[in-house]
From Swiss-Prot:
It comes from Aspergillus fumigatus (Neosartorya fumigata). Its EC number is 3.4.24.39. One of its GO terms (cellular component) is extracellular region. Binds 1 zinc ion per subunit. Disulfide bonds join 178-249, 256-274. This is Neutral protease 2 homolog mep20. Zn(2+) binds at residues 299, 303, 314. Residues 20-172 form a propeptide. One of its GO terms (molecular function) is metalloendopeptidase activity. The gene is mep20. InterPro entries: Fungal_M35_metalloproteases, MetalloPept_cat_dom_sf, Peptidase_M35. It catalyses: Preferential cleavage of bonds with hydrophobic residues in P1'. Also 3-Asn-|-Gln-4 and 8-Gly-|-Ser-9 bonds in insulin B chain. Belongs to the peptidase M35 family. Secreted metalloproteinase that allows assimilation of proteinaceous substrates. Shows high activities on basic nuclear substrates such as histone and protamine. May be involved in virulence.
Amino acid sequence: MKVTILASAILALINGALALPANTPTLDVTLTQVDNTRIKATVKNTGNEKVTFVHLNFFQDAAPVKKVSLFRNGTEVEFTGIKRRLLTEGLSDDGLTTLAPGGTFEDEFDVASTGDLTEGGTVTIRTDGFVPITTDRKVSGYIPYQSNELEIEVDPAKAAAVPQAIKLLDRRTKVASCSGSRASALSTALRNAGSLANAAASAASSGSSTRFQEYFKTTSRRPENVGGRFRAVGREASSQSSGKTTYYCNDPYGYCDSNTLAYTLPSSNLIANCDIYYSYLPALTSSCHAQDQATTTLHEFTHAPAVYSPGTDDYAYGYRASTALSASQALLNADTYALFANGSPLLPLSNHSKCRNTMVWRTLL
């Protein structure tokens, strides 16, 4: 086992790059090996104030979410767990963690349960990103986190004996287990997501370069992979009887909860909506950078590598955190695509007048 202590130095670079206030809290993540592929993460609040943050899609989440990235010979090992989109307001307490200054918590998990490590050998593990912080159960900002780089030697026999977190379901038609009002809602969401994606593709290719840079953090002429990903989402959303993904109206794996809108299983290109997708979200929002069914569906489609490869990750949620990412992270951040699709005044589906100059919305999500 080899541990490289990079967290403090990299967090300092992150804080400088984002021009965060000097007293901005950060989370320091220390990864250690427990036994073979079983890993312990110790998360510490290095700031001088108490923070409450969303621990879903992060350490302490009991679901098979992506807590770390695994690399073998410089290539990332495919993640076989779930990626989910969360509420940004009205969050329940069971999705929140509070840490006092200097406070810590630990989380143990087995990386072989969400990644094929049966080849054994040297595997490098690390993680970084932003965790949403909350005020009165509403996301009000973000806190950066960064881990050390942990190098482990994997025993292939032991790795093969670790049960996979998710057992694949039988393949079905593109839209599965849908009927009644949910089928109607999903049909509308797919149609709207397709229209938003196609309009966003045009905005990315020939719209404002300033707006493009605002979201994707690059001054180069709109990388083709942005417009290409939006166009691919538009194609995938255009048919409910064929396509490259399987879309469930309900929760086939049991990973929905009171804070989860929908989730994607990238390794099988499966998407599932949760109950609050229907009960909480409008079909289309009239508010700048707010959540709705259409952009949630668009968000999930970007996770699926069969739609456009590589699939996106969840480096950050919401406008403030997503526009604080580096260019390389923003280009692979699912919420960046959802926010760009919602936040462009070129898009025809809902009232986006509040987003006509999104640069003034830095205080929003």
